[in-house]
């Protein structure tokens, strides 16, 4: 019960009057003034208690009992009386239990007063310069206070808390409590009220009378928990075991030795490779645990500056043991994180983002590296060793070699650098192919020279280097294998073809493809074991090769995704990369200058007229019909040159088109169009808009490069993502190999090369191709058509059909036709070019005619090599000055040809020192390897002259070996006889050439004085004629000698 102190006028008589009350105090609450109330005083004996009615504010009156008569007497004598209801006082005031409605009204009044006080408090606290309810004050990273708005989520939570607080009832300390005493052995008042309130539910069930056993919960105080933690830490430290504290934030602890003392180490974020502003998340409970942990971490010895270094990350120490400058710590312990500007930082405090990147962490990275190295090395090393391992190599050298091997396999600046990993994935930068090969060679040499005992490391690097050098650049053999194996469907030739396609890929081939290559090789081995040959024959009389009237279906041109709304083909990125074709192998037509200069398409041994002039269309129908007539060429019948055979059967796709009667189909006039690519050789042609390189520009292929239209047609079927690589391969690799006017065989080989890397081009349609058997040229018709008519039509329609020309067993003259031609071959014939005797005669004619020899060498730079047949021709070639004249020309024109001529000059000097023809021939034979090497450096098209020179040099090389054996055995008589016959014949040819020169000189020597004397006698006397003639002859003789000397000096 609360103590009540009040002052009132109390009388001992029965009176009813209004009196003014004083102050009333409840317990320790401040006194409260009382309003005027009616006090009823009853006269009672001194021993009887007195009743008082007290009213507080608007509350119901409360009846208060007073003490006995002695107390009343005292109160009458004192104006103010203090009554305490405790039992220790003389009198007790007992407040009777009010009704329940009164209690509710008391609660309502209290809530109203509390709300009023809260409003007053809020109004008094509100300042015009303060913050709003939806704002808060935060501290920035630089230590500056800043007002920021609260989030909508935070405001929602705040309003929810206020609602819950308002709904809670207010329990006053003076609220009456129900008595727990029973009256007459019955239930107490509190039990009766609780029984009235409780609802028996459900009504239809009988409650169980079984008493439930409730076990007492085992509880431990905070002090007991701390004692338990200390005991566990002490045990784990002794055993060096790991601890994991599970709270709001888990903490993992282990024990390590530093400075001969065992410390506790916490796993912080940067030990896991993470850089965060707060390295360790810890609350109050975690900090308390860390404080306990610090008592058992170390031995309390002072840690001087410089002791804490790499490897101390996460170690827990006491604050007072550190003497170095340090940051603040949220508790008594200090968790070491790192150092920044000579200041240690605790892992639990939050630092700025910039500092988190600059701080030097004290993690032992090397230890972590070797920890992972040892773990994986021991886990994955092989167990099938037949010996017992022991330490026989120097550990330091092992580490150095391991570092070199790591750099060879994984070139990097740091093994933990993610950018170096990206370079290795993309094979770029320091991990590019050439860079790795160069670096690999350097490191291998270092291991060989500095670590001779590590031979196995050198072997591993050798194998690795071999795997990197996996680019297959043997294009010539690839083409020859393709020509031999493609199209032969019998025996092992299909397997040879597929094996060739896999080998050309090199390192880009997958393991599955290599497995397939082994299977193909097995089939080839079986074929070689059981070899069979079948001969089939075909008759030209029964040859029919009709062209299909149905157009070839090209899926690329039918795909809606590659067509615009008008149905035209969309080049996309292919059009952009097609610039590599148009800028290098096409020239721009200027319509302002007219089309006349482009009407005649000149080839080395002929010409063909284009229909480009027909782009100007007249409006007169008669003139227009007259314009649609072509200019026929001389017709050519169906011969063996028109067909291609494979094992006796006709390969119709590689033949000329015929009618049903067997006559050749002659080409008609092909009308021109602008800005189009025309493809399709069967049925109606297809017109594809050229890519928009430059607006309203017309392009025509340069002379010798009309076959570029084939690659441009293949580009239609190439994926956009591969267009760049496709055009680069064509420009840099294939066109440099093909050159001008290549053969159809070379063009077909180039198409197969592209098919290997870009399979989608196999069904690409080709432009129209016309065959001119007279000039042995195949014309690739572009969008400007052909005014010349009467050519044969080649049936080849797709790239796959064109590749059939590469088959080695294909008997065809067409594959040797030029897509154009060469001047040397067309002027002199392939048979003469392939004959060494004809070539050396041609060289002999040019020995004393340097201008003619220079023109011949422009077409055939290998012509001087035929002088190797005769030592006399080499000496004449050297003594005449023609060799020196050609050297001076080719030093600036072609250095590779100049090198060949220098080798010939040195050979001529060696030959001149020997008198015997046989000895001279032996000198020539010993110089053959040098000449062959010099010839290999000369770049030129694979024409008839080049192939003839290759065969000639191969013949000399193969003759030199048995001749050397015969000479050592003494069998030289027959050879001497044949050489002498050849030398006499060639010497006669050289002599006739020299006689011509002498005859011209003699004529000049005789005619000059006669003409001069005649001119002199016309003006002067006859007596002086003979004397003047002698003087003129002498002057002419002197001049001729001076000119010869000057010419020799200039040649030198």
Swiss-Prot record:
Where the record places motif Involved in interaction with stylet and aphid transmission is 414-417
Identify the residue span(s) of motif Involved in virions binding and aphid transmission.
Answer: 672-674
Gene Ontology terms describing biological process: proteolysis; symbiont-mediated suppression of host innate immune response; transport of virus in host, cell to cell; viral translational frameshifting
Q: What is its EC number?
A: 3.4.21.-, 3.4.22.45
A matching Pfam family: Potyvirid-P3
Molecular function (Gene Ontology), one example: serine-type peptidase activity
Q: Which residues are tagged with the site Cleavage?
A: 362-363, 820-821
Q: Which domain of life is it from?
A: Viruses
Give all residue intervals belonging to the Peptidase S30 domain. 219-362
EC class name: hydrolase
Q: Where is the active site?
A: 270 (for p1 proteinase activity), 279 (for p1 proteinase activity), 313 (for p1 proteinase activity), 706 (for helper component proteinase activity), 779 (for helper component proteinase activity)
Keyword field? Host cell junction, Host-virus interaction, Hydrolase, Inhibition of host innate immune response by virus, Protease, Serine protease, Suppressor of RNA silencing, Transport, Viral immunoevasion, Viral movement protein
Sequence ranges assigned to domain Peptidase C6 in this UniProt record: 698-820
A GO cellular component annotation here is: host cell plasmodesma
Post-translational modification comment from the UniProt entry = Potyviral RNA is expressed as two polyproteins which undergo post-translational proteolytic processing. Genome polyprotein is processed by NIa-pro, P1 and HC-pro proteinases resulting in the production of at least ten individual proteins. P3N-PIPO is cleaved by P1 and HC-pro proteinases resulting in the production of three individual proteins. The P1 proteinase and the HC-pro cleave only their respective C-termini autocatalytically.
Relay the domain remarks: The N-terminus of helper component proteinase is involved in interaction with stylets. The central part is involved in interaction with virions and the C-terminus is involved in cell-to cell movement of the virus.
Q: Which family does it belong to?
A: Belongs to the potyviridae P3N-PIPO polyprotein family.
For this entry, the protein name equals P3N-PIPO polyprotein
Tell me what organism the protein belongs to: Turnip mosaic virus (strain Quebec)
Its organism's taxonomic lineage begins at: Viruses, Riboviria, Orthornavirae, Pisuviricota, Stelpaviricetes
């Amino acid at each position: 019960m609360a103590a009540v102190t009040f002052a009132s006028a109390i009388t001992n008589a029965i009176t009813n009057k209004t009196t003014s009350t004083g102050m009333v105090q409840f317990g320790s609450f401040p006194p409260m003034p009382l309003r005027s109330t009616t006090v009823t005083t009853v006269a009672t004996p001194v021993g009887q208690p007195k009743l008082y009615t007290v009213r507080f504010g608007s509350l119901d009156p409360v009846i208060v009992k007073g003490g006995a008569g002695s107390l009343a007497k005292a109160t009458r004598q004192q104006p103010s009386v203090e009554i305490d209801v405790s039992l220790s006082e003389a009198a007790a005031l007992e407040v009777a239990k009010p009704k329940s409605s009164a209690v509710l009204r008391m609660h309502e009044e209290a809530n109203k007063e509390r709300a009023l006080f809260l409003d007053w408090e809020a109004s008094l606290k509100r300042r015009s310069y303060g913050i709003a309810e939806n704002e808060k004050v935060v501290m920035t990273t630089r230590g500056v206070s800043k007002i920021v708005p609260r989030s909508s989520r935070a405001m929602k939570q705040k309003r929810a808390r206020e609602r819950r607080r308002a709904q809670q009832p207010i329990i006053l300390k003076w609220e009456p409590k129900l008595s727990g005493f029973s009256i007459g052995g019955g239930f107490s008042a509190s039990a009766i009220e609780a029984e009235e309130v409780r609802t028996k539910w459900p009504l239809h069930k009988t409650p169980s009378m079984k008493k439930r056993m409730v076990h007492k919960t085992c509880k431990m105080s905070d002090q007991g928990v701390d004692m338990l933690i200390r005991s566990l830490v002490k045990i784990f430290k002794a055993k060096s075991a790991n601890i994991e504290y599970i709270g709001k934030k888990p903490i993992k602890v282990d024990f390590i030795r530093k400075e001969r003392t065992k410390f506790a180490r916490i796993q912080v974020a940067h030990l896991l490779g993470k850089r965060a502003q707060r390295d360790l998340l810890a609350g109050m409970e975690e900090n308390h645990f860390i404080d306990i942990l610090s008592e058992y971490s170390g031995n309390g010895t002072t840690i001087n500056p410089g002791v804490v270094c790499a490897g101390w990350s996460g170690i827990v120490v006491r604050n007072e043991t550190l003497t170095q400058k340090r940051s603040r710590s949220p508790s008594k312990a200090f968790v070491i994180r790192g150092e920044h500007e000579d200041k240690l930082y605790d892992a639990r405090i939050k630092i700025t983002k910039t500092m988190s990147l600059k701080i030097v962490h004290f993690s032992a990275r090397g230890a972590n590296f070797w920890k992972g190295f040892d773990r994986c090395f021991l886990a994955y090393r092989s167990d099938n060793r037949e010996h017992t391992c022991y330490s026989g190599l120097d550990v330091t050298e092992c580490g150095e070699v391991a570092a070199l091997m790591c750099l060879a396999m994984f070139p990097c600046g740091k093994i933990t650098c993610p950018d170096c990993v990206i370079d290795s994935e993309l094979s770029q930068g320091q991990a590019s192919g050439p860079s790795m090969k160069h670096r690999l060679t350097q490191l291998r040499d270092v291991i060989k020279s500095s670590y001779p005992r590590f031979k196995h490391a050198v072997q591993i690097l050798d194998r690795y280097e071999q795997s990197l050098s996996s680019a297959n650049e043997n294009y010539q053999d690839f083409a020859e294998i393709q020509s031999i194996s493609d199209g032969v469907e019998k025996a092992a030739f299909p397997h040879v073809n597929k094996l060739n396609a896999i080998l050309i890929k090199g390192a880009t081939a997958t393991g599955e493809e290599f497995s397939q290559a082994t299977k193909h090789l097995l089939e080839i081995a079986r074929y070689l074991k059981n070899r069979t040959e079948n001969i089939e024959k075909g008759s030209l009389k029964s040859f029919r090769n009709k062209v299909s009237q149905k157009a070839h279906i090209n899926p690329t041109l039918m795909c809606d995704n590659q067509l615009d709304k008008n149905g035209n083909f969309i080049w996309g990125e292919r059009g952009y990369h097609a610039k590599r074709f148009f800028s290098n192998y096409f020239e721009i037509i200027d319509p302002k200058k007219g089309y006349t200069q482009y009407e005649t398409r000149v080839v080395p041994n002929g010409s063909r007229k284009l229909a480009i002039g027909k782009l100007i269309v007249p409006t007169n129908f008669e003139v227009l019909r007259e314009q649609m007539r072509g200019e026929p060429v001389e017709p050519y019948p169906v011969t063996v040159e028109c067909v291609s055979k494979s094992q006796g059967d006709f390969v119709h796709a590689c033949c000329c088109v015929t009618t049903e009667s067997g006559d050749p189909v002659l080409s008609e006039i092909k009308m021109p169009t602008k800005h189009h690519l025309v493809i399709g050789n069967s049925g109606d042609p297809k017109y594809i808009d050229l890519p928009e390189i430059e607006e309203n520009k017309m392009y025509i292929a340069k002379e010798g490069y009309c076959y570029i239209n084939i690659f441009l047609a293949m580009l239609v079927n190439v994926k956009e993502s591969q267009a760049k690589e496709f055009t680069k391969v064509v420009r840099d690799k294939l066109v440099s190999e093909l050159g001008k006017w290549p053969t159809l065989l070379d063009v077909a080989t180039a198409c197969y090369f592209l098919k290997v890397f870009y399979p989608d081009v196999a069904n690409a349609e080709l432009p129209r191709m016309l065959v001119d058997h007279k000039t042995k040229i195949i014309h690739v018709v572009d969008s400007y058509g052909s005014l010349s008519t009467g050519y044969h039509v080649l049936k080849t329609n797709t790239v796959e059909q064109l590749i059939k020309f590469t088959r080695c067993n294909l008997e065809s003259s067409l594959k040797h036709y030029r897509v154009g031609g060469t001047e040397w071959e067309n002027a002199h014939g392939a048979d003469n070019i392939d004959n060494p005797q004809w070539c050396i005669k041609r060289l002999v004619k040019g020995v004393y005619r340097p201008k003619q020899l220079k023109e011949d060498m422009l077409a055939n730079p290998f012509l001087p090599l035929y002088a190797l047949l005769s030592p006399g021709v080499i000496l004449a070639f050297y003594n005449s000055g023609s060799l020196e004249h050609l050297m001076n020309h080719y030093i600036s024109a072609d250095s590779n040809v100049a090198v060949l001529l220098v080798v010939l000059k040195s050979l001529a000097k060696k030959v001149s020192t020997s008198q015997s023809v046989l000895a001279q021939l032996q000198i020539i034979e010993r110089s053959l390897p040098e000449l062959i090497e010099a010839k290999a450096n000369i770049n030129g098209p694979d024409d008839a002259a080049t192939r003839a020179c290759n065969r000639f040099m191969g013949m000399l090389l193969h003759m030199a070996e048995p001749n050397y054996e015969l000479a050592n055995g003494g069998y030289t008589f027959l050879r001497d006889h044949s050489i002498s016959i050849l030398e006499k014949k060639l010497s006669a040819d050289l002599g006739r050439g020299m006689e011509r020169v002498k005859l011209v000189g003699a004529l000049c020597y005789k005619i000059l004085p006669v003409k001069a004397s005649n001119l002199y006698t016309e003006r002067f006397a006859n007596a002086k004629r003979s004397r003047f003639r002698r003087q003129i002859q002498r002057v002419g003789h002197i001049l001729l000698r001076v000119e010869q000397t000057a010419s020799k000096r200039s040649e030198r």
